[in-house]
Amino acid sequence: MKILVVDDSEAFRRVMTELLLRAGYREVTEAGGFDEALEAYSRDHPEIVFVDMVLPGRSGVDLTKEIMSADPKAKIIAMSSVINKAMIRQSLEAGAKDFLLKPTNELALSSVLTLWSG
C-alpha cells in the first residue's frame, strides 16, 4: 500500500515514516508542504494520505479540498497537535475521513490504517 505523509516538520515526517515502515508499509512518501504534496499525490497515487492541517502557506484543509476535487475517492487522514472542534469539523467537511492527534503512537496509527485501508 502506498502512503503519503504531509507535514512541514521533517522530524515528525521521519517519525511517521519509521512507524509505518515498522508496521510493514514499504511504500511511504513524504512531502513538506502544499505543492510538494500535490506533486507526490499525482505521481504516486497513494491509497492513504496523512495531512497535517497546519501547513505554511496554504493549509492542510486547502490541500484536502484540492486532492478531493481531483480524486473524490481519496482517503485523507487529517492530523494536528492542536485539537478543537472547529478544526476537526473543517477537516471532515473538506473530505478527510478521520482525524489523528499528533504526536501519534503505533496503536492509534494502526487503528486508523486498519479502518481505512480496505
Walk through the language-model features, giving the residues of each.
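Acidic catalytic/metal-coordinating carboxylates
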Residues: 33, 59-62
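Acidic, metal-coordinating helix/loop segments flanking the phosphotransfer/catalytic sites
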Residues: 30-48
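Two-component/phosphorelay signaling modules centered on CheY-like receiver
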Residues: 10-29
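C-terminal output helix
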Residues: 86, 104-113
